[in-house]
Amino acid sequence: MNIKEQFPYLYETHLHTCQGSKCAKNTGEEMARACKDAGYTGIFVTEHNWGGNTCIDRSLPWKEFVTEWSRGYDSAKETGEKIGLDVFYGMETGFRGTEFLIYGITKEWLIDTPQFREATVEEQFKLVHEGGGIVIHAHPYREEFYIPEIRLFPEYVDGVEGVNATHSSPLSVSHNNPIYNNRAIDYAQKHNFPMTAGSDIHSVNLFGGGTAFDHKLTGPKDFIDSIMSGREYALTDGKEWYLYSELMKTKQVLD
């Protein structure tokens, strides 16, 4: 039995819609339908927040901002319920180009936590944990014009996005350099971090990346438990599939 057969429940953990992220091309409904057609069990909608490339007016009052910013998730969620795709709430936070994926929080929590808007990286970690979520460092070694420097915060993250399909998928036309993933995996190895895989997808032209499990997730908490507990799971960029345990032992080419 191959890895894909062992871990048949695939989740896109890094996805943007044009309703929350300025750089995305498609709505939540369109993304949900495309992911369902591609065989995903579920998706996390992880829009760029106010510190990143959001398309929502940052001057809006907090509750109104969160409501507008969550439209892509709402659209995907409504569609997912109709077509049989699990849709979970997430976020990609930005700090001068350094970005983090947040899992396990809800829109209601965000509305009730306005101090999150001005949180530092350290404060973000504390607040997210208080809200029952986790912080994953997104593509920590990506080099791009909007990232002035690579900054690592091992004490303020729960894990690392080790496989970002944008870096390694043959279908990707941006940020395409597998060395960024290799360095992220090496970083995870050195700190014994859990890893996630996602496509960082911005349109319905999917890469097929994601994190896969041997069971259907019951929700974001199950996702968190499944990657934090030491249980086996799989990571893919849509082309290659890896066992987490094997990836943690594989020496990486770093330059």
Region locations from a protein language model:
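An N-terminally biased module of ancient metal coordination in phosphate/nucleic-acid-related enzymes
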Residues: 1-95, 205
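Charged catalytic cores and adjacent phosphate/nucleic-acid-binding surfaces used
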Residues: 1-13, 17-21, 27-33, 96-111, ...
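Conserved beta-strand positions in the central sheet of alpha/beta enzyme cores
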Residues: 44-45, 136-137, 161
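Short, well-ordered beta-to-alpha junction loops that form the rim of enzyme active sites
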Residues: 48, 92, 138-141, 199-201
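Glycine-rich tight-turn/loop motif centered on a GG-T
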Residues: 61-63, 108-114
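Short beta->alpha connector loops
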Residues: 93-94, 116-120, 140-144
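S-adenosyl-L-methionine-dependent methyltransferase catalytic core, i.e., the SAM/SAH-binding region
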Residues: 123
